[in-house]
Amino acid sequence: MANNVYAYSEIFDSIQGEGEYTGYPTAWLRFYLCNLQCNGFSQDDPTDPSTYKLPYKDFDLIEVNRLEELPVWEYGCDSSYSWSKKFKHLQHRLTSREIADNIRKAFTNEHNKGKWLNRHMCFTGGEPLMKHAQLCTMEVMQHYLNDDDYPKFITYETNGTQMPRPEFIEFWKNYPGELMISCSPKLFTVAGETTKRAIRPEVVARYMEFADRGYLKFVVTGEKRAWEELDVTIEKFREAGVDWPIWIMPSGATVEGQQVHDGDVAKMAFQRGYNVSARVHTYLWGNLIGV
């Protein structure tokens, strides 16, 4: 275990800005690599790749030495730096012990001497349920258990397409804390990912075997076709036995992008009885990486 080295994009301390844990002090580990790209986000027509604007592809990295120096792009995935090969050289590679120690250092300050207390732990990406990330998170959490100081509240922010490994399921069944799965399936009319690739109710149903809690969080625009696809997609999850609550988040990686239709989308959501999530961290600190 000690010799395994894992690639990750970021470790930072902030709050959770989305979903059920919004506002909670949260330690973050963002993994590198994802099986989806979601280049359709914020595009004029997410279903037509020929019309995409993807500024991350043309961005000049010659003077960039750290991921934190990158902008948050208006179009496409807001964390393309955590999966695109273009940014591979900027990723960090450490053992799980080193990662665990760096997470603890991230929330150590004059008010907290490095104890978990009630701090929330969030694994994100990229995709934090890819094989290497499942292995890494088990090792990291085992280090904390061995230290006898471990997070009591944990979330995986996943796209819901990665099957859990048997040892991963067993680990979380026995973990002495609450595991939340924040599952964000990607809609074709919003993210540009095909239903075949992005919507896997049978996979999410497996998450229910070991997660204490969970919810489905969909990024949606104000377009009628997006809501029609949402209705069909939710029904697929319900048919698979996934009865988790529904959260709706207006599309837009930046504050400016969200303000285009966030109020309209929120109203469409609560009128249907769905929960509404904003990206609170962007309203607090702007369009930055590491918050």
Question: What are these regions, as identified by a protein language model?
Answer:
Residues M1-T95, N109-K115, T282, N287-G290:
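N-terminal [4Fe-4S]-dependent radical SAM core
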Residues S84, P128-L129:
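Glycine-/small-residue-rich active-site loops that bind phosphorylated ligands and cofactors
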